[in-house]
Amino acid sequence: MTREELIAWATRNGWKLDRWGHLKKEFDNGTHRLKLSRIAARHEISTPFGWARLASGYLKNLSINADGKLAGMNR
């Protein structure tokens, strides 16, 4: 999966790009972020102390499964 494919999937599912090029979305348990780098993505949640990593994975290992969900991230 490429960075552009990940951004396209995320924006179709309600994620919004912030000014730093990361994707954010509000959930019942708080703000989540997909922090994108050149080769990897991290799924993080906002805490009172900053961002905490929930899962991460290299873009080459990420894919969209049959249910339309992101697969390939490790905890």
Segments (PLM) and residue ranges:
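Generic detector of ordered, mature protein regions
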Residues: 14, 19, 36, 71-72
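Acidic, low-complexity, intrinsically disordered interaction modules
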Residues: 19-65
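Short amphipathic alpha-helical "recognition" segments used for binding
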Residues: 8-9, 29, 73
